[in-house]
Regions:
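An N-terminal hydrophobic leader/cap segment in hydrolases
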Residues: 13-82, 341-344
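Catalytic histidine-centered segment of alpha/beta-hydrolase-like enzymes
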Residues: 278, 304, 310-324
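Short beta-strand/loop motif that positions the catalytic acidic residue
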Residues: 256, 262-264, 268-272, 276
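The serine-hydrolase catalytic nucleophile loop
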Residues: 109-123, 136, 282
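Catalytic nucleophile-loop/oxyanion-hole region of alpha/beta-hydrolase
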Residues: 110-113, 139-168, 172
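Hydrolase active-site cap/lid region
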Residues: 187-245
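Conserved alpha/beta-hydrolase
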Residues: 123-143
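Short alpha-helix in the alpha/beta-hydrolase fold that links the catalytic acid
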Residues: 280-293
Length: 369
């Protein structure tokens, strides 16, 4: 064999070995960074005072701090369930004295329910709804070594809805998810919610876990999807026991029109900010197509809301009035009340001035964590 051919074959072999190593090592890196539980990188809003991000205006942050003080000034009931794979999952419940329903707030990736819903907790409570703030598996007080992008979490939210049905019979439930939480509540549609779930809100969710992982690899980590993404997919299959490309929120939403699963479709609101720099706005445009008829019109039980100025998860803050109006239309379809409930002013056990201090000693002032 000519020397040149030997060189070509050796070069091709070396490239193949290199690609295989990148496939395995880069994929494992992706698994460790994206999937494995990492409490150091997670949102610490329950333990520490909230801090302002560059994308938040002073007005937005003031509303978020008000929500933080509103929740942290109350004592929570901690409730737990056992997931279908044996993990213990935890939620905090803040019951309204004259509850019209229960808002299940499902947070996003490496976040917390308080971090993602601080701007919404008080308006929701003021409508007469109890707050049910869950810790997704792999986050907070819930067990779990992996974050699964809805693969297992979709069953968790259905099980939480069943828990509420048993604990509070007849109480309507609203499933409300942001980012990965949005993907979770949409994927739950494909599992089958119990009949106490009367409405769903899905804010800035993705189409599939695989699609958002590829997008983040390319746009934010500046890494090639091949071979790293596919190596990561292999490690997820081996170690986390799910296939990131076999799960689709777009497909799950189609189940809302399945009469065998939902004799009466659950009204749903899809929301997304145009300036979302993390989950592409186009993903919600694709998801909403699952809720259109053959002529491209939204099905009667669906709502779509967008804010021109909102970044990731900020539509509620950037267009509060428009978002609340969309919730009102959603609730009208669901037969749920949404007018404000008057009640005596609540005085937190801990003064609000203390709860919102930047140098707050969390061990001394917080009533819950």
């Amino acid at each position: 064999m000519p020397l040149a051919m030997h060189i070509v074959l050796w070069t091709l072999g070396a490239v193949a070995v290199l690609l295989f190593l990148v496939y395995l090592i880069g994929g494992y890196f992706m698994y460790r960074v994206a999937i494995r539980r990492d409490d150091k990188r997670q949102n610490k809003c329950w333990e520490l005072p909230m801090s302002k991000r560059d994308s938040e205006s002073d007005e937005d942050f003031a509303r978020m701090k008000e929500g933080e003080a509103f929740v942290k000034g109350r004592l929570a009931e901690f409730v737990t369930i056992t997931a279908r794979d044996g993990l213990k999952l935890t939620a905090r419940v803040f019951e309204h004295p004259e509850a019209r329903g229960m808002f299940v707030m499902v947070h996003g990736y490496r976040s917390s329910s308080l971090g993602d819903f601080s701007g919404a907790v008080k308006p929701v409570y003021d409508m007469g709804y109890s707050l049910f703030l869950i810790d997704q598996r792999g986050h907070g007080r819930s067990e779990g070594k992996n974050v699964c992008f809805g693969a297992f979490e979709r069953y968790d939210v259905v099980d939480w809805a069943n828990y509420i049905k048993q604990r509070w019979p007849g109480l309507p439930v609203v499933m409300d998810g942001v980012s990965m939480g949005s993907g979770t509540v949409m994927l739950g549609c494909g599992v089958g919610y119990p009949d106490n779930v009367k409405a769903i809100i899905a804010d800035c969710g993705y189409t599939t876990p695989g699609a958002i992982c590829r997008s983040v690899l390319h746009k934010h980590m500046h890494l090639p999807t091949f071979p790293i993404y596919y190596g990561g997919r292999l490690w997820k299959k081996l170690l986390a026991k799910y296939d990131i490309d076999k799960i689709s929120a777009t497909d799950a939403l189609k189940k809302l029109s399945d009469k065998s699963l939902y004799p009466h479709p659950i009204p749903i609101l899809i929301a997304h900010g145009h300036k979302d720099g993390f989950v592409p706005y186009a993903m919600s445009e694709e998801n909403i197509k699952s809720l259109e008829d053959k002529d491209g019109n939204l099905l009667p039980f669906a709502e779509f809301f967008t804010s021109e100025e909102a970044d990731h998860g900020m539509s509620f803050m950037k267009d509060y009035d428009g978002y609340m109006a969309a919730i009102g239309r959603l609730f009208d379809k669901a037969g749920l009340p949404h007018d404000k409930v008057e009640e005596p002013a609540f005085v937190p056990e801990t003064p609000v001035s203390e709860l919102t201090r930047d140098d707050a000693d969390t061990g001394m002032i917080y009533t819950i964590n």
